[in-house]
Amino acid sequence: VSAMCLEALRSFGKIAVEAVAGHSLGEYTALYAAGSLSFRDAVKLVNLRGKFMQNAVPLGEGTMAAILGLDRNIVNDICIKASSKGTVEAANINSPGQIVISGKVAGVAEASGLCKEAGAKRVIELQVSAPFHSSLMKPAADSLAEELNKITIKDASIPVVSNVTADYVTSAGTIKELLIRQMTSPVLWEDSIMKMSNDGFDTFIEVGPGKVLTGLIKKINPKLKIYNVADAATLGDFLGSWHPGQPAEAAR
């Protein structure tokens, strides 16, 4: 869906996209936008990736929780302490004060309790089928690596900001390596947006259903201009306010 929204946007020929980024699964759309993955390969990889993650940990053994209102260093320290009960790690650094943890049910439960004691505003257990972006996804990462060897990954035509490093990447070889590492690494979304903001990017377009990333970006830097293109109505709104040739960063 995100790729189709992107193509609808491109068909008007008004946008000079200078970099792209995607959150977790959305990184595949970003790589498609940058010409690194074909649409066919991106869809294939996304489908296989989901299956590999489901098979990595038996259903019911892993979970995730959102921690609101605590500094990331505190959350990381708590995860280390709670890991005595079971694997638990930071999985998504989404925005200031919004961190998702992932791991074994007992480890996440222990960390959630400690986060509440440390003053977290809210701790929300997420309804997920697996502990994504944790070391428990190593079997899934290994399976994905095998599939990546079967497809063609091209150098990106524009910089892609990696979830793993929060830095620009264009090399096909590095992109492949980072897609594998992404399975077991935290999504550094806050760091990615700050990197681009510090480098002068001031306009972002969220492409695809929903406004989750728009909300996160506003929390990271309220001064940034953010647009959302999710359907015909929002596409029309965007085209009515956009200035041709204006540089942008596409997020999904």
List each language-model region with its residue ranges.
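Alpha-helical and His/Cys-centered functional microenvironments
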Residues: 27, 137, 250
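Acyltransferase/transacylase module recognition
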Residues: 1-17, 149-252
